[in-house]
Every structure is written in structure tokens, then in C-alpha cells.
Amino acid sequence: MAIVKCKPTSAGRRHVVKVVNAELHKGKPYAPLLDTKSKTGGRNNLGRITTRHIGGGHKQHYRLIDFKRNKFDIPAVVERLEYDPNRSANIALVLYKDGERRYILAPKGLSVGDMIQAGASAPIKVGNALPMRNIPVGTTVHNVELKPGKGGQIARSAGAYVQIIAREGNYVTLRLRSGEMRKVLAECIATIGEVGNSEHMLRVLGKAGANRWRGIRPTVRGTAMNPVDHPHGGGEGRNFGKHPVTPWGVQTKGKKTRHNKRTDKYIVRRRGK
């Protein structure tokens, strides 16, 4: 893994910083684990915009990732590491002893030729997936389930991880990167180690077009709009003279957005405290 700063041969290259990984596979992805991915332009079935700033971008195939890690007690070998345009993390193609291939998130330190395994009897080793009741307290894990059998939902992006800090009864307590501490059923499966490609945060796109390649359209400030388009719009000068709100008038910048009170009992400590 190397950080490469491009030479300023043009305005669009001047500030570009790339993350180069020589271990990544340079050929095509494994076709049986690909699925079609249609562009929506951020529109729903009525043609109305439901998500702003989406449109265009390069065509992509979706890689079918094994987030459940439910092929228990069958060892697998890492065939290759690959780039995935759908996520910040890299992925690994693994070949199981019974001949099946699957994609998994590539954890930090996993290399081609390494052996991995899932199941309660798997050793504590990077890339192995176990129920958290079998993982020692203090271990760093990723791709953590919130419900047994549903598949990993926590810590899936590049460089992400959570730490198991306690085990009590049927629950384990996790410390998330945000500082939040929450309880999860000990039967839930997690993968040992942290997600790889942590240098992803250091990349600099360098020009607007690089975001357009990714299907991301420009974000216009509310103060630059007319009053008909945004509550911050219009007026003389740049001061909109009110509390900041979304285009639909909902308070922003600090307003609480969590509404799922049913699971509040599992959160031991809120993030940022």
C-alpha cells in the first residue's frame, strides 16, 4: 500500500493523492459473484428525486459479498484481493475446500494464500469469523452482526473496527469508533481484525470530475438559491438570518435524528461523550 501524490501536470492533477495497492488483482472480477446494478439518478418509481446529488457515473457491477460468514468449519484460502467500486474497503475472493468461492471484506493484514475459517471452533486469527461469545474481551473485530444470522452491519467500511470490552450473560458490550458503547447478543458473528485499506481517508480526488465519475453531483448551498428553492435563499448579501435548516425546513446542525426508541436500552453510552 502506497500513497502517491501526482505531479502538477495540469490543474486537475495538481492536488490528486492516490492510494496504490500492488496486491490488488488487475483482471476482471469473478463473474458468478456479480450482479447488475441499475442507475436511478436518485429518483423513485414516480420519477421524483428522493436522494439529491446523485446522477451519472461509471457503469458498475455489484459484487455479492458474504456478510453472513455462515459457511462454518470449512477452511478457505484467499485466492486474490480485489478493488470494489461499491465500497471504500477492498474485498477478497476466497476458495473453500468444497470448491465454492465467495467474496468477503478484506481485513488489514490478510494476504493471498492465507487460510481463513468461520465457526465457533475457529482460532482467533485475522479474517476468521466467530460468535462473539467465543472471542476474548479486548479483541478488535469488524463486520459485526446486530441480529444473529442477519449478516454483519457494523464496521464494514475501510479502516473500521469495534472493540469487545465486556461480556455479561447473553450480551457483549462493544465500543464503536464514534465512542458509542452498545450491547449486542453474544451469539452474533463478528470477524477478527479491522477492515483494510485504512489509507482510503487520505486520498484526494483533485477535481470535480472525479466525483462525477463516482455518480456524485454538485451540492449547491442554500444561500446561493432563490427563496422559492430553499429557506436560506434570497436576500441581499450572504447572511440568511435564521437558524440553519434543510431545504424542507427541518432544523439541522445538531438536531437529534434518532427515532428508534425500541433499541435505546441496548446503548450503554452515546457517541461523543
Swiss-Prot record:
It holds the Pfam family Ribosomal_L2. Residues 221-262 are annotated as: Disordered. GO terms for biological process: cytoplasmic translation. GO terms for molecular function: rRNA binding; structural constituent of ribosome; transferase activity. It comes from the Bacteria. Keywords: Ribonucleoprotein, Ribosomal protein, RNA-binding, rRNA-binding. InterPro entries: NA-bd_OB-fold, Rib_uL2_dom2, Ribosomal_uL2, Ribosomal_uL2_bac/org-type, Ribosomal_uL2_C, Ribosomal_uL2_CS, Ribosomal_uL2_dom3, Ribosomal_uL2_RNA-bd_dom. The keyword Lyase does not apply. GO terms for cellular component: large ribosomal subunit. Residues 253-262 have a biased composition (Basic residues). NCBIfam families: rplB_bact. HAMAP family: Ribosomal_uL2_B. One of the primary rRNA binding proteins. Required for association of the 30S and 50S subunits to form the 70S ribosome, for tRNA binding and peptide bond formation. It has been suggested to have peptidyltransferase activity; this is somewhat controversial. Makes several contacts with the 16S rRNA in the 70S ribosome. Part of the 50S ribosomal subunit. Forms a bridge to the 30S subunit in the 70S ribosome. Belongs to the universal ribosomal protein uL2 family. This is Large ribosomal subunit protein uL2. The lineage of its organism: Bacteria, Pseudomonadati, Pseudomonadota, Gammaproteobacteria, Pasteurellales.
